Swiss-Prot record:
Residues 40-55 have a biased composition (Basic and acidic residues). There is a cross-link at residue 30 (Glycyl lysine isopeptide (Lys-Gly) (interchain with G-Cter in ubiquitin)). InterPro entries: Cup1_sf (IPR037130), Metalthion_dom_sf (IPR017854), Metalthion_dom_yeast (IPR022710). Cu cation 7 binds at residues 32, 34, 46. Cu cation 1 binds at residues 15, 17, 32. This is Copper metallothionein 1-1. GO terms for cellular component: cytosol; mitochondrial intermembrane space. There are 2 copies for copper thionein in yeast. The 2 identical copies CUP1-1 and CUP1-2 are arranged in tandem. Cu cation 4 binds at residues 19, 22, 44. Cu cation 6 binds at residues 22, 28, 46. Cu cation 3 binds at residues 17, 22, 34. Cu cation 8 binds at residues 34, 38, 44.
């Protein structure tokens, strides 16, 4: 599991966020480069969780 997260960071994934709290979450923004126009849930392809919702803000897609 952890190696997958490291791979995501190393591969420079494109981050297509459907953001709720993800776009307001510093850690998600750092890892994911979430765009500011997000208005949906909090998912983007990186390994973090939203501090607010405790849900994954990222998916492995």
């Amino acid at each position: 599991m952890f190696s997958e997260l490291i791979n995501f960071q190393n591969e420079g994934h494109e981050c297509q966020c459907q953001c709720g709290s993800c776009k307001n979450n510093e850690q998600c923004q750092k890892s994911c480069s979430c765009p500011t126009g997000c208005n949906s849930d909090d998912k983007c392809p990186c390994g973090n969780k939203s501090e607010e919702t405790k849900k994954s803000c990222c998916s492995g897609k």
